[in-house]
Amino acid sequence: MADSRNGNARAPPSGVPPKAGNTYSIDVKNFISRARALYEHWKKHSADLWGSADALAIATPPASDDLRYLKSSALNIWLLGYEFPDTIMVFTKKQIHFLCSRNKASLLEVVKKPAHDELKLDVIMHVKPKGDDGTGLMDAIFRAIRDLSRGDGNDSQVVGHIAREAPEGKLLETWTERLKNANFQFVDITGGLSDLFAVKDDTEVMSVKKAAYLAYSVMKNVVVPNLESAIDEEKDVTHSALMDLTEKAILEPTKASVKLKPENVDICYPPIFQSGGKFDLKPSAASNDELLTYDPASIIICAVGARYNSYCSNVARTYLIDATSLQSKAYEVLLKAHEAAIDALRSGRKINTVYQAALSVVEKNAPEFVDKLTKSAGTGIGLEFRESGLNINAKNDKVLRPKMAFNVSLGFQNLECESESRSKNKKFSLLLADTVLVTDQKPELLTKCSKSVKDVAYSFKEDEEEEKPRKKARTSGSENYITKTALRSDDHVVSKEELRKQHQAELARQKNEETARRLAGDSSGAGDSRSTAKTSADVVAYKNVNDMPHKELMIQVDTRNEAVLLPIYGSLVPFHVATIRTVSGNQDTNRNCYIRIIFNVPGTPFNPHDSNSLKNQGAIYLKEVSFRTKDSRHSSEVTQQIKTLRRQVMARESERAERATLVTQEKLQLAGNKFKPLRLSELWIRPPFSGRKKIPGTLEAHANGFRYSTTRPDERVDVLFANIKHAFFQPAEKEMITLLHFHLHNHIMVGTKKTKDVQFYVEVMDVVQSLGGGRRSAYDPDEIDEEQRERDRKNKINMDFNHFANRVNDMWQLPQFASLDLEFDQPLRELGFHGVPHKTSAFIIPTSSCLVELIEYPFLVVSLSEIEIVNLERVGFGQKNFDMAIIFKDFKKDVLRVDSVPTSSLEGIKEWLDTTDIKYYESKLNLNWRQILKTITDDPQSFIDDGGWEFLNLDGSDSESGGSEESDKGYEPSDVEVESESEDEASESESLVESDDDEEEDSEQESEEEKGKTWDELEREATNADREHGVESDSEEERKRRKMKAFGKSRPGTSGGGGSSSMKNMPPSKRKHR
């Protein structure tokens, strides 16, 4: 809304064109296409729009810090991409002349050859030396105009110029004076330029859309929250203060949750805030220094204009506070008229029909308001905030065409309120404005900020019987007019809680219906989600006896054939390493060394993917064997060789089984010569590649996916766009890393690891250790410089990642990727909370579609669309923290628990769950979700008949303890069960496969070192014997309770069985005997 405050669209931040050799350059392809459009338009509309001009003279004034819009600057930016201040351009039928400084001429050199080759136009540079007035160069241009005109048979030359732009600066004043004395005829070409700029190309349309997105995001995410905060807390805020706050949000888009580069955005005009009876709907309006007024019958008008790549957008809204009936009626009529005007912006219609559509609505619904309606319904918008010639009024008969953009602005000026209780609010105005794009079909609204009555009208009055005000108005005298409760302190909280309860009740009804439908259609019932074991090839070390090596009679390790040769009864007997469960060695006081080998027997498979040891269960198996020797060196060497070989074979078999379950994906299409792939360098990857020495790599965005690679040929990962379920960009704020994270639909292999989450990150701070040893002062210059360098490095890395993410987002907007619905999501830190999703505390942050924790490994990514309900457990008075159980729609999936969430985060989490339409319950105890879900899937009809999930809604009744355990002694996970024999043994072997190398060795030494049967096996035998005799002793109950403590905080939902093998094989009884 700037008319007198016209704003120059400057591409370089300094407002001057870039110098040769720097990062700025002219887009030659863009120049050719638009120069061709200029000449074609000039030729086609020479008589009616260009005044039959033989030449077009465009003089751009020097740069200015004032916010202004000029046709000459607009032509510069439209044609060349930048504004060229203090420059003269002259277009003739066969030549383009530039009169400018040397630096500008060197930048313009790149257009000479393409213009001649493709447009048959000669580009001629007239370089003005410093200190010269340029008169000689101007005479040369005049001669060229006359020569070309004589060649066409014209004696008199007509020169088109922009009549409204007065000359500024010495060069332009000299030019104007000499041009007038050159005996040319002059015509105004403003209409021709306006019509040329009216229809946008695809690049311009995208810039207008991004500008509109920024404008309405600032309105929605900055303006409205600040207004509500000021009203809610009864703050004294001036219009100018709100203007400054809003302007900063436009110039720093991240404050409005918009991912646009700050250097590409600007304001169209200083944001406008008006209230208190003083309103001006003209584009030149300004925010004054008076306080924002929000008394009853108050009107607040807010207008925001934003630019992206110099293209403008606008949005304006009116907010009503305890509106009177007249104000409500006037707004409803204005809203209908505004929507009618937008709907009338159809290709082929005349512009005056748009204004007539709005006027007809007012005449029909409120004829008394007709004389108060603004005389214009807006203007065209683009490089200029107000494109002359495209005013939406009753006289403009120009025809609408696709890809025209309009600022549809309509209002009522100086209406009078029937209530005279407040003279300040007696007069009021209303205004609505939106940026709209004309298309081949219906118009496209670009500023999608709500303007419905329910979203802009605020009511703070209590019912008539409760009309005693709780608080006096800030500006009231002896009378009390305001009784606000909808956004005021205690009453506001109660109202908000009631609304949330109502919404949760509706969600409960919907969720029960949805669950009933899903269970009714689920024929699988309580099927097991675990995959069946895969049988690999038979474990055979040697096909016949002749293949065995002939060595001396001692324990040997044949690495090539993966066999261990044991001397038994005078012969070497081969055992495949896959048959060995553990090996250990120790030494007694007599220097005798013992090597003890325990083999796999039926019921304890080599790994979870192999079932060979389940074959021939009726045969006799060797359980364990021990050897004694005096050679300690050989003993330790053999033990280590067997462990190493077993570990290698185990890893290979595990990787082979994992790869067999992978989903086949398409090939990555590398970027060819058409475009250079987007690239981020010096990144680290998680999960990392195997190997001791890690090296950074490069992430590239190709035609259909990403490729991460290092200098090592075997370290390469391809992530296809089609396999990405969620993409996240998390800049470093309070963390040490900036990251890009991809959560995938199907697993991929990263080195030898199978994963659904791949992350690429950079550490934003270098670890520096001072060798001086002394403590530095807080004001030490070196310390300050170092901190500044760290801040600069962090900001640069964040900017690089942000640029990469934005470029990829633009790529994902292409039609071929539209079905994937991909966009980099950014975590919302203000909604985050601390909790323990795995083993350590982490900061968990919601995004628009997920709940994530991307810093600590293992990562947490939960899709909100997959959540059935959330149960908040151990919620009660006096508790410092509580637990959050997330139940998924797939009941075969283990429940995810986030433990030890601070109680201070409870209200925020409940509010977030409610706003994302997730049903939540609260309970005082932890529930046994494995048993609950098993009961539901076993008998879904009973679950539905009993009211579905409403069994959780027991208001803290202790009857919940049917599936729970007491938690008054502090947190103990209640869903850890005493596992059956088969589960115990399976998880035992699984933990061996999935644990790290060091953990595995420790586990073997601690759990298998001095026993044949494990302690679990011995205890189970004793327990079974007791059960056969009908005995269940108190000590057994005590052992169960202690065993759960021994498991620590592991849960079936996260670890698949809980604990490592060393924990499983060390029950309380063993600790007690030690």
Curated annotation (Swiss-Prot):
Protein name, entry field: FACT complex subunit SPT16
Task of the protein: Component of the FACT complex, a general chromatin factor that acts to reorganize nucleosomes. The FACT complex is involved in multiple processes that require DNA as a template such as mRNA elongation, DNA replication and DNA repair. During transcription elongation the FACT complex acts as a histone chaperone that both destabilizes and restores nucleosomal structure.
Pfam hit, one: SPT16_C
Biological processes per GO annotation: DNA repair; DNA replication; vegetative to reproductive phase transition of meristem
Lineage: Eukaryota, Viridiplantae, Streptophyta, Embryophyta, Tracheophyta
Annotated region (Disordered), positions in chain: 1-21, 505-534, 954-1074
Biased composition (Basic and acidic residues): 505-520, 1010-1032
Gene from which this protein is expressed: SPT16
Amino acid composition bias (Low complexity), ranges on this chain: 955-964
GO terms under cellular component: euchromatin; FACT complex; nucleolus; nucleus
Tissue: Widely expressed. Present in embryos, shoots and roots, whereas it is not present in terminally differentiated cells such as mature trichoblasts or cells of the root cap (at protein level).
PANTHER family attached to this UniProt entry: CDC68 RELATED, FACT COMPLEX SUBUNIT SPT16
Keyword annotations: Chromosome, Coiled coil, DNA damage, DNA repair, DNA replication, Nucleus, Transcription, Transcription regulation
